[in-house]
Amino acid sequence: MRIFVFLVLLTVAIGTENLNSHVFPRPLIIEYPEKQLRDELKCTTWRFVVETNNLSPWKTIPEECADYVKEYMVGPGYKMEIDRVSDEAGEYAKSVDLGDDGRDVWIFDVDETLLSNLPYYSDHRYGLEVFDDVEFDKWVENGTAPALGSSLKLYQEVLKLGFKVFLLTGRSERHRSVTVENLMNAGFHDWHKLILRGSDDHGKTATTYKSERRNAMVEEGFRIVGNSGDQWSDLLGSSMSYRSFKLPNPMYYIL
């Protein structure tokens, strides 16, 4: 008798479960892999402290963040952030009351600010490899780096507004010709001055070198109103601009 009652109850339970499952299907639950989530959060945190200059200096991206950085650089995230920074810079530029003496300056860095070296870094694992200056120089000498579209737009806007544009780059003076050609082919024209590292600048940190060049601008009577760069060393130091705009770059760090 007990066996019969048990079988009846079991049959009813199964039937009810099947009915409920048919009428009210259970939601499909996808369990996000815990390790993948942990790694992504770790890499997001790493990029945050990098972009806020709280992790310095560093030589390569963490190995576990290689896929994360790649997806960020080639996906929509990088472009959206570049666009946002450039849009904010453009709004600021339009708000400035320029003097009548032609002494208001906007400084642009070149690499990862006006020109993109993403084709090079895609072949070098997006910053996972230790920087090789010989290989990078070969890339520079090709003169094929494309423009960052939003930076080109900002560049043209500040020129139209009446700013004098200075290009201040860590590239060597021996790369002047190819840099000029690359910039012009990418759509950049009419800058006031292109400043590259001379023989006396080798061995200096980027912060020191760029500070010295900005000091010279100020001594000549220029007002540094805006500055755009992908490295904190483009922006910090002495004779800083009234406002600086940091473009994202999780692939490498320059002191």
From Swiss-Prot:
> GO MF annotations for this entry?
acid phosphatase activity
Question: Which family does the record assign?
Answer: Belongs to the APS1/VSP family.
Kindly give the PANTHER family that the UniProt entry links to this protein.
Answer: ACID PHOSPHATASE-LIKE PROTEIN
Catalyses which reaction(s): a phosphate monoester + H2O = an alcohol + phosphate
Write down the glycosylated positions. 142
* InterPro entries reported for this sequence: Acid_phosphat_B-like, Acid_phosphatase_pln, APS1/VSP, HAD-like_sf, HAD_sf
UniProt-listed SUPFAM superfamilies: HAD-like
Q: Which domain of life is it from?
A: Eukaryota
Protein's name according to its UniProt entry: Acid phosphatase 1
> Which keywords fit this entry according to its UniProt record?
Glycoprotein, Hydrolase, Signal
Quote the Pfam families the UniProt record gives: Acid_phosphat_B (PF03767)
* Organism encoding this protein: Solanum lycopersicum
Report the EC code(s) recorded for this entry: 3.1.3.2
Signal sequence range: 1-15
